[in-house]
Amino acid sequence: MAAPAPVTRQVSGAAALVPAPSGPDSGQPLAAAVAELPVLDARGQRVPFGALFRERRAVVVFVRHFLCYICKEYVEDLAKIPRSFLQEANVTLIVIGQSSYHHIEPFCKLTGYSHEIYVDPEREIYKRLGMKRGEEIASSGQSPHIKSNLLSGSLQSLWRAVTGPLFDFQGDPAQQGGTLILGPGNNIHFIHRDRNRLDHKPINSVLQLVGVQHVNFTNRPSVIHV
């Protein structure tokens, strides 16, 4: 399957109102062959990708790799989304990495993330969805979710690598991630492919697209009245 064209529409972190999902992939069904590809849970059990959003909508966030400090800090903010907010909108939040499944539990402990999480260690779903490899030079603006600078963040990642039980990058360091809104069934409502490590979607802009209340990520979770 040829990789679909990238979606270039961006939403700034300061946006108050976000248009309805659009782009060349939105409204098109996910190929059945992609939906059947397996992901692994924290126990190494295989689950068809499409089963994750068969019954309801899901925000699916593909991260670069579990040692990436940017991914770590982004997922730390995903962890702050109250489960009740997602339940009210009948939405599932899913993170997918591309490491061995053995790294899932330590990553969740590190970030405090307790929503659904899986891995695609062969990166087959990443490839079939057209996720990029390498860094595209593009201005992504200031992320509201990244707290560390390049030096301190890189040192943290290196320290985690050398002190971990297995010295590895917990995934391909050149792989980029992305965000999708999928389901129920194989419906694609929105897709964004990260052009570089800082090009992830501001979380509240994605939550607004699925009718989930905004979260104040500067402190503890709370509703933002707009």
UniProtKB/Swiss-Prot annotation:
Tissue-wise expression: Expressed in gastric tissues.
A Pfam family hit: AhpC-TSA_2
Gene3D superfamilies per UniProt: Glutaredoxin
SUPFAM superfamilies: Thioredoxin-like
Tree of life domain: Eukaryota
One Gene Ontology biological process: positive regulation of glycolytic process
InterPro entries documented for this protein: PXL2A/B/C, Thioredoxin-like_sf
Membership in a protein family: Belongs to the peroxiredoxin-like PRXL2 family. PRXL2C subfamily.
Function, in words: May positively regulate ERK1/2 signaling and AKT1 activation leading to HIF1A up-regulation with an increased expression of glycolysis genes and enhanced glycolysis.
Protein name: Peroxiredoxin-like 2C
